[in-house]
């Protein structure tokens, strides 16, 4: 299993999304440290789409841990995995390879700039549907928690 996770995301969560993330963070932190770094959303109205995306990219890239294996969440170019495959073929091998620190990068409403995608060691997708960035963060944490349970041979549902 991974030894440490960092989530670097555009935007601050509120309401139900913040509550959902806090629930899964509490569960995950029993197994390994998880840090969440939120960067400010760029003002698209003031900057325009392209410049706003570049500004967010700079903020994200500056906050990515240098020692981490970086996973970008991207609907268009990311690879899709089932829960078992995600646990056994992606997360478990990272720990064995010595790259136990994984940083997940999640864009805001504009997505991720090409330079962020290029920096990533790999890209994941949760499918063809477009998820709001807040929901993508909840889904990521839920899948990480599910992977922990799979790898430890523990029950997920009671």
Swiss-Prot record:
SUPFAM superfamilies: alpha/beta knot. GO terms for cellular component: cytoplasm. It is found in: Cytoplasm. One of its GO terms (molecular function) is rRNA (pseudouridine-N3-)-methyltransferase activity. InterPro entries: Alpha/beta_knot_MTases (IPR029028), RlmH-like (IPR003742), tRNA_m1G_MTases_N (IPR029026). It is an enzyme of class 2 (transferase). Keywords: Cytoplasm, Methyltransferase, rRNA processing, S-adenosyl-L-methionine, Transferase. CDD domains: RlmH-like. The keyword Cytoplasm applies. Its main location: cytoplasm. Transmembrane segments: none annotated. It catalyses: pseudouridine(1915) in 23S rRNA + S-adenosyl-L-methionine = N(3)-methylpseudouridine(1915) in 23S rRNA + S-adenosyl-L-homocysteine + H(+). It comes from the Bacteria. Pfam families: SPOUT_MTase. Gene3D superfamilies: 3.40.1280.10. Specifically methylates the pseudouridine at position 1915 (m3Psi1915) in 23S rRNA. Homodimer. Belongs to the RNA methyltransferase RlmH family. This is Ribosomal RNA large subunit methyltransferase H. It comes from Rubrobacter xylanophilus (strain DSM 9941 / JCM 11954 / NBRC 16129 / PRD-1).
């Amino acid at each position: 299993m991974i030894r440490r996770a960092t989530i670097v995301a555009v935007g601050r969560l509120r309401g139900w999304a913040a509550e959902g993330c806090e629930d899964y963070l509490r569960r995950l932190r029993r197994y390994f440290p998880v840090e969440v770094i939120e960067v400010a959303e760029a003002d698209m109205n003031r900057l325009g789409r392209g410049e706003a995306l570049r500004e967010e990219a700079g903020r994200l890239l500056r906050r990515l841990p240098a020692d981490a294996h970086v996973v970008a969440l991207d609907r268009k170019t990311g690879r899709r995995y089932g829960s078992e495959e995600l646990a056994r073929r992606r997360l478990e091998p990272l720990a064995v390879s010595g790259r136990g620190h994984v940083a997940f990068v999640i864009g805001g409403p504009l997505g991720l700039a090409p330079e962020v995608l290029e920096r990533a060691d790999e890209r994941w997708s949760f499918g063809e549907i477009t998820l709001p960035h807040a929901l993508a963060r909840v889904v990521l944490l839920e899948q990480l928690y599910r992977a922990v349970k799979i790898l430890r041979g523990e029950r997920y549902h009671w």
